[in-house]
Amino acid sequence: MAIYAIRSEFLKKTSEIAVSWFSVLNAFFVITLASSVSKIWSSKYNPSVAFKYGFGLFFVALGYLVVWFGAKGLSEDMKISMAYIILIYFFHTIGELFISPVGLSYVSKLVPHRMLAFMFGTWYLGIAIAQKVAATLGGQVVSITKEYGLSTFFLIFAGIAAGAGILVMLYNPVLKKLMHEVK
């Protein structure tokens, strides 16, 4: 059934790939890249948690920069190449692999055992709040696009992610001190 649907879609003169088809990319990149990232953390190149977070945020910024570049000069009726969409998923997934497992690991290492379930819930509540903020900011795309262009919208997010990455890395000594040598 799926083969028939794909075949009939691509035999048309003009073909359009549904956005929903790209949702599999995150899972694909997690499965294919997780072991490589894990190998980095278990080798001699195991940076501190702040640097892992910072690098993860830099990869998120890089993903937004790719889309910023792809969206430069596009008018409203034009569509971006799927290569840019694949690249943003690639870089954001690497960023996710640098941030999410490390964050969960350090929640379990740093929180007193009696508060562990509560803090994991707080971690996921933070993710839910971030999703709500992202939806609210995403609603601003029309007003920003009208005034500055679509590429500027992505450039703003790249700047925020890169700035947060720099900030986290600058606070590395403070975070190490607060973690009391937990590795």
Region annotations inferred by a language model:
Residues S23-V30, F120-A135:
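Glycine-rich segments within core transmembrane alpha-helices of 12-TM secondary carriers
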Residues L65-F69, A128-V141, L170:
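A gly/Pro-rich, aromatic-decorated transmembrane alpha-helix motif that marks the paired
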Residues I40-W41, L137-E147:
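Interfacial helix-cap and linker-helix signal at transmembrane-aqueous boundaries
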Residues S42-V60:
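Cytoplasmic membrane-interface "Motif A"-like loop-to-helix N-cap segments
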